[in-house]
Design a protein with these regions (language model features):
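Catalytic alpha/beta core domains of metabolic enzymes, predominantly
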Residues: 47, 55-182
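Acidic (Asp/Glu)-rich catalytic clusters
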Residues: 22-29, 51-52, 87-91
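General beta-strand structural signal in soluble alpha/beta enzymes
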Residues: 4, 35-37, 50, 59, ...
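Active-site beta->alpha loop and helix N-cap motifs at the rims of alpha/beta catalytic domains
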Residues: 1-46
């Protein structure tokens, strides 16, 4: 797949994001295209709409487990919308959810250093991996069970988590910290 992003200035504008994503899909018109839509609150309806129209989407800028859950729900609901509109074969709809890793530790580490206790400092570099592990458990839950099985029977693909921003920003950490921990 190749990903092309909607204009980032539209991240807080549902209607224009949807219009831009649709226009990119129609302009490029390639089966291996994923249009990037930011995982903002305003992006969630666009994700659902595009998936419901049978278009492949790369959801970007996911920084929290709660938002990741909302992104997966938008994807699954979009697949259900596709079925409700008469699409019987869902196998051509693909999506990834780009969950950003290192930026979480960058922010949390800064706050832990402000606290400055030994206990706080011992937690540096651990939040992002822990959050990704929790997110993965939600992935397992979302893409199993009767609701998912009904979609999978029509060829639906899981929305794969994409661990993004896996290079460390802190020079004290191994360059492969996140890759090593998440494999």
């Amino acid at each position: 797949f190749v990903s092309v992003e909607v204009d980032p200035a539209l991240a807080r504008d549902t209607d224009r994001t949807t219009t831009d994503a649709r226009a990119l899909h129609e302009l490029i018109n390639a089966p291996n295209l994923m249009v990037k839509i930011p995982g903002t609150l305003e992006g969630l309806p666009s994700i659902r709409t595009m998936i419901g129209e049978g278009r492949s989407i790369n959801v970007t800028l996911i920084f929290s487990v709660s938002r990741y859950i909302e992104v997966m729900e938008s994807y699954v609901a979009g697949l259900e919308d596709a079925v409700a509109s008469g699409q019987e074969d869902l196998s051509d709809i693909a999506s990834v959810a780009s969950f950003f890793i290192s930026r979480t530790d960058t922010e949390v580490d800064r706050r832990l250093e402000e606290i400055g206790t030994d206990q706080a400092l011992d937690l540096r570099g651990k939040t992002a991996v822990a959050q990704a592990q929790v997110a993965y458990q939600h992935f397992i839950t979302t893409f199993s069970g009767p609701r998912w099985d009904a979609l999978a029977a029509k060829g639906a693909q899981v929305q794969r988590p994409l661990w993004a921003s896996t290079s460390t920003k802190n020079p004290r950490y191994s360059e492969t910290l996140y890759v090593d921990e998440l494999i």
